[in-house]
Amino acid sequence: MPAPYKRKKHSGKRPEDSHDAKRPKQKHGRQEMRTITRTARRVRRDEEGEEDEQVEENVNEELESQDDDIEDGGDIDDDKGKAYDALLTLLSGDHQEDTKKNTSVRAEPEQTQESESESDEDSGDDEIAGANVDDDKDVDEEGPEEDDGDDDQQDPFEVHFNQVSDTFIEEQEKVLKDKPKWTFADKKSMEDAGYTYTFQVPPNPIKTGGKVKGQSVNNYSIKQRLVSPFEKQHPESLNELEGVLLDSMVKYQDINYVYKTFDNESYKKLYVLHALNHIFKTRDRILKNNNKLHSYQESMKKGKTNIEEPELRDQGFTRPKVLILLPTRNACYEIVELLIKLCGSEQQENRKKFNKQFSSKETPPDSKPEDFKHSFKGNNNDFFCIGVKFTRKSLKLYSSFYSSDIIIASPIGLSMILENPDKKKRQYDFLSSIEVLVVDRANQIEMQNWDHVNTVFKYLNKIPKDFHDADFSRIRMWSINDQANLLRQNLVFSEFSTPNINNIVSSKSSNLSGKLRFKPVTTSKNCIMNSIGLKLKQIFQRFESNSPMTDPESRFKFFINSVLPSLTRSTSYDDGLLIFIPSYYDYLRIKNYMKTSTKFTFASIDEYTSQSKLSRNRQQFASGKIKIMLYTERLHHFRRFEINGVKNLLMYGLPSNPIFYKELVRFIGKSVFREIADLDLSFIKILYSKWDAVALERIVGNERAPVLCNSVNEMYEFR
């Protein structure tokens, strides 16, 4: 058996598990918590910013390393909390702690500028790397930006954020409260790309112009200072799919995009370009309005009292405008590298520290599948939340959240700041003015714990408790009126769709510019079933379910009343039955029922099972001492075990990842190869309902899925 992949450790308790859990101590530098709520105009802060100044040394608040990990395991009363603790117990004692001694960092004079105050300490695995919630105001190096000549009133940025009237927003808010049906404004099939997309709009949407088509980013509303670096890094022309994606992004429409294969990363360059474009356009708008106010003030000083004071609303409550949620530090490292390449900054502050905390050359074992190696390569620690700030000539990492332009975080890292057990230390105001939200590699995040994503949404665009020296004369009225969610753009990227992921755009989004859903075309030719390579009996058994809400209960009753009683009678072997259960909560319920209400000899392995018990149960199942074994989807995701001795397979539900279906079926193929099972006697049985249509389509193709879900017959067999 190959050695288990050693994944980075992290904190062993979620905040909701115990309010008494040990928390990382914080090391405070300068801390100025401002509660100023003045509404008078500020004196222009950047008047003297013409000359190139050295960026003021930052005094970052860093979380102190914790040497003693919180113990994993133990009894957990709240089943909801178990979904994340499962992974922690699974990995305890299984991974190595980085014990390298810390070394001080010397400043690099050229490309990378390190702050003198920076100590290049490794962020402990239990720390939230990058966390800096100081309310300090860094000195901006902002001078007048070079004019790209793109101050166009037809620019989607202007149309979406600056030209919408207060009356329009108020009317739309009232309409959307009644939950009207969004209409399909467009539907198209892109045969060459293998996609279809649908575009939905609310009643009376924001109209950001017609479709733009072009093979160059120059055809889109992108700032010229970004076009050259982008074309230098990516000289190839945009294909049709990339063009539609970029056009939708710059028009601030919501996107739910399934990138189909784990190694498809072409979309990342587009959303990074869009995020930078949004940041630079926001900054340029503010600087130009500063100049207008300065001109007005100069005119007033000269005695010109007949000039009307301009009302220039161009900001939110706080500076951060883009939030990017990612599953691991390595994913964050890759996005920051893209930001650096595309932004054209001459200096990058704290880059050496960032590389040390976020990058790693570690790779999973070669025995693991390619998608597993892609997901867990590099530093796969999932505790991080880092601010990124842009000035005229530099990019600054580890900036205070309140002076950052972009915040890149894992959902768990961010949620532990938002809902710190110590209420006095909770911070969420820096999310009050997020205008572009990106959720990338959403399937990986879902396997960690989707509850943390829901926590983040709870605090997005929430009116801040403190106003952090905000200038209310510059804040847009839709921010003040708590209507920012109507204009926030949500970009969601996943390898395959699930109800949780679809829910972000379908239910949590109220974007008045509309929403697009990109769906890959899965046919009987390219579906996962067609790639297995085994002529094995595959039985699909449908059960009746009245609604998605009652589906778990209907599935359980069908299993205990119809499937379980005939389980041993319907198989040709009295051992080697693997029961795969996607949901951990269903797994607990079945495990308890089989233990208390049946006489089956069975074992179970899940996210909480200790390493010794995992090995023992797998060995006893392979030898036939244990007849039945329960196996969870999340355990398979994080460990990718090769289960020996499988002769028959029962899927309590369809796996969310179609690759898992192929891997599970091949467990039987391995037994056939070892001549402990016969291909004609072994079988797979899959339980499903009509609500599983999306997952079913990935397995059998879009031609068969409607038949399996809606026809009279309830059982179908494939080979």
From Swiss-Prot:
Keywords: Nucleus, Ribonucleoprotein, Ribosome biogenesis, rRNA processing
GO cellular component: nucleolus; small-subunit processome
Gene3D superfamilies in UniProt: P-loop containing nucleotide triphosphate hydrolases
Record flagged with keyword Electron transport: no
Region forming the signal peptide: none
Record's compositionally biased regions (Basic residues): 1-12
One of the GO biological process terms: maturation of SSU-rRNA from tricistronic rRNA transcript (SSU-rRNA, 5.8S rRNA, LSU-rRNA)
Superkingdom field: Eukaryota
Location of the protein in the cell: Nucleus, Nucleolus
Any GO MF annotation of the entry: U3 snoRNA binding
Family named by the database record: Belongs to the UTP25 family.
Record text on subunit structure and interactions: Component of the ribosomal small subunit (SSU) processome composed of at least 40 protein subunits and snoRNA U3.
Role this protein plays: DEAD-box RNA helicase-like protein required for pre-18S rRNA processing, specifically at sites A0, A1, and A2.
Protein name (record): U3 small nucleolar RNA-associated protein 25
Source organism: Debaryomyces hansenii (strain ATCC 36239 / CBS 767 / BCRC 21394 / JCM 1990 / NBRC 0083 / IGC 2968)
Lineage summary: Eukaryota, Fungi, Dikarya, Ascomycota, Saccharomycotina
